[in-house]
């Protein structure tokens, strides 16, 4: 009840001139696990509370809908892309929950479970992953609130998680950590090299620990699906070796149609490029 009152007073509508559909922004969403931040909930223009909707949880929420507020004046165009796919009948109707990042973005999107397996001296001195706490925020606080306020299918079959770069990293981790919550994950330009902005030390041992974690924990069954991709420009070019290792590992699982990987020559590490191919993972997760 207290949470509902706080969020009701903090809710505002998104800039309608930039948004296709409906966008509600809940400023300073409180948490016991991480610092508060904005949570942005997008619903289709014909949202009907008497119907049930799939839900996609996305990271870096401030970069999803409105280029006028982003650091580089680029956006994913989530509202336009998904509106078009719904209207064409290509996907099931869905809601998108965009969760803003914080100043601890790298730490919050870092898979906590691999830290003990990374050799001493590889991670920067004093580094602490907040990945587990961030996912508890998503799973234990944001999701129950969304399922209570909006008309959603709450089961894993209809719940997905998506992000790019480090957001792709934490999406793949969430997919493994909470297979009972997320039936699918989409990881664009996944930061599989685990290159750390605070050190020049080679992070290959950390990348190998991450891949081993995926190998041991991927929910490789018929009820779960995983999408990954990369370009080859800018930092995306540095993912070639680690992403190839992931593809090889997943191929050995004989996962058939549950895994989709796409390579986009000439594309870089930017919202404009992720927007240009967003329809592919969304169709894979939500296609009829």
Describe each region flagged by the PLM.
Residues 7-10:
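C-terminal motif of bacterial Sec signal peptides marking the signal peptidase cleavage site
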Residues 1-2, 245:
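Sec-dependent signal peptide recognition
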Residues 3-5, 21:
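Intrinsic-disorder/low-complexity peptide segments enriched for small residues
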Residues 13-288:
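Non-catalytic cap/lid and distal C-terminal segments of serine-dependent acyl enzymes
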């Amino acid at each position: 009840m207290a949470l509902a009152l706080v969020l009701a007073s903090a809710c505002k509508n998104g800039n309608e001139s930039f948004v296709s559909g409906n966008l509600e922004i809940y400023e300073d969403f409180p948490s016991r696990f991480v610092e508060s931040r904005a949570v942005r909930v997008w619903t289709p223009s014909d949202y009907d509370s008497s119907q049930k909707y799939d839900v996609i949880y996305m990271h870096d929420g401030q970069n999803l809908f409105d280029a006028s507020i982003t650091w580089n004046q680029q956006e994913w165009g989530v509202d336009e892309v998904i509106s078009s796919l719904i209207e064409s009948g290509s996907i099931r109707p869905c809601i998108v929950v965009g969760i803003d990042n914080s100043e601890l973005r790298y730490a919050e999107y870092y898979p906590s479970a691999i830290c003990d397996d990374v050799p001493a001296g590889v991670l920067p001195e004093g580094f602490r992953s907040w990945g587990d706490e961030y996912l508890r925020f998503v799973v234990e606080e944001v999701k129950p609130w969304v399922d209570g306020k909006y008309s959603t299918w709450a089961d894993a079959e209809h719940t997905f998680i998506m992000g790019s770069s480090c957001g792709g990293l934490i999406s793949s981790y969430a997919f493994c950590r909470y297979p009972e919550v997320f039936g699918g994950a989409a990881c664009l330009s996944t930061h599989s090299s685990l290159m750390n902005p605070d050190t020049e030390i080679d992070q290959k041992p950390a990348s190998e620990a991450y891949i081993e974690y995926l190998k041991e924990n991927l929910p490789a069954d018929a009820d779960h699906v995983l999408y990954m991709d990369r370009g080859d420009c800018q930092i995306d070019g540095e993912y070639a070796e680690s992403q190839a290792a992931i593809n090889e590992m997943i191929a050995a699982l004989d996962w058939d149609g549950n895994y989709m990987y796409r390579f986009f020559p000439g594309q870089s590490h930017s919202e404009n490029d992720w927007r240009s191919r967003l329809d592919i993972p969304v169709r894979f997760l939500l296609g009829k």
